[in-house]
Each structure stands twice: as structure tokens, then as C-alpha cells.
Amino acid sequence: MPELPEVETVRKGLAKHLQGGTISSVELRREGLRFPFPKDMEDRLTNRRIKAINRRAKYLLIRLDDNSTWLVHLGMTGKFTLFADESEFEEIAKHDHVIIRMENGAIAVYNDPRRFGVMDLINTGGEHNHRLLARIGCEPLSKKFNATSLSKSLENKKSPIKTALLDQRIVAGLGNIYVCEILNRAGVSPRRTASSVASSVGRAESRCERIVVETKQVLTEAIAAGGSTISDFAAVDGDLGYFSHSFRVYGREGEPCLT
């Protein structure tokens, strides 16, 4: 599943080419993905100008000029591919489920073989009350994510720290890949009880502080590298993510330790 760096990579690619443009048509090639598409989604997106493209956790928030937001989650295998015009978009592939044509001729195609993605239309500003976003924790690259806030979230957790960091209610956007890398760099065992990590706050270089520092560092490096391509992730221009070449632990079982 695309994690925060991969979704941010997609966001940046879409924003570069689509932000400020107007949608001329939308073609839905099935009735939904993980859930049915919103009623009249084609009509509601057509002739709308894209004001901005934001991200919350692993969700894309495409802001439209009618005060609505097109919410997109890529699921396990969802991806957007951009084409400059019809001459580049030669034929519709088997799993191309949503085709967006822009007034300037550009085409954005959403492809999702496993169909675990999600699309919805919501009122801009009301996303915090949406059933998929209401309980999501703070953004790990924000100032709100610090040793104190992390400690407070972990203090009563009896689960392993790895499990806790995967909980989207504690911190947004992390998945198995990046939690493994973060804990390795922070020198914290993934099996350590989350509450014991919280209890170290106040000591010199607490475990929470190390986790926060390494979270921000790993995510920043991963975004700069275009995310991680394990199987089928690609940016909107087809480029692969190269942070996978920097893995110290994920997918390296049985190989020499790099720590």
C-alpha cells in the first residue's frame, strides 16, 4: 500500500500538472472501487477548476472551485498516470477505472487492479468529520508531532511500538515500510512495549525523541527519492521510487546488517 511518501509524490505530480486547470470531462468505467462512487460524480467534477491538491495522511484532497473536495485513497494498487494529450493516451488498459480529461488536453487516468481505492466528494473544510478522516492522528512532518505528543499517545498502549506507530490514530500516514526503517534508525526494538517508550520522555535523548527525529528524517528522504517502489508503485509520470535502495531493514531478512 502506498504510504505517506508515495502519496505525497503523487500529490506533487498531480499538482504540478493539474492545479489551476479545469476538468472538461470524467469517464467512470465501473460503478465504484472499494465503495460505490458518489452519485453523479461525473457531472459534479465536470467543468470544475482544480484550485489545489493537498494530502492528509494517505489521502489526496483535490480542492475544487465549488467548495467541494474530491477525496482519493489509492488503496493497495491504485495509481494516477498523466498524459499530455490524446496522442500519448493510445488505448484504455484493463484496469483503467477513471479517466479525467482537462481543458488543456491533458489526461489523468486512475488505474487500480485490486480496486481497494476510495473516491468520495465532500464539502471543503468538512473533511475532519469524514468517516475515513475523523480519527486520524497528527501529521508526522508537522510541529505537532513531537516527543511530548507522541509520549502522550503511547503512555497507555500495551501493544508493541511497531503496532502502535502503524495505528493511524496515533500518527498519520505511516505503514510497515517506514515504521521498520524509523525504528531501526532510532535504535528501538519493534517488539518493545509502546508504553515503555513513552516512559522514557524526560531523560536525555529519550526513545520518543529519537523516534520523532528519525520519522521526520526518513520521510523527508523518502519524499525526496520519490517514495519506494516495491512492486507496482510509480509516480504520475511513470518514474519509480528510489528510496527502496536505502532500506536498512525492510525486506532484507537474512542479509548482512547495515546498522
Predicted segments, located by residue:
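Gly/Gly-Pro- and Ser/Thr-rich, intrinsically disordered tail segments characteristic of DNA damage-repair
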Residues: M1-M119, E127
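Alpha-helical structural motif
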Residues: E3-E6, V10, Q19, F37, ...
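Basic, nucleic-acid-binding surfaces and adjacent catalytic neighborhoods in DNA/RNA-processing proteins
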Residues: T22-D40, N54, E88, S151-T259
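Phosphate/anion-contacting hairpin/loop surfaces
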Residues: W70-G187, V197-V201
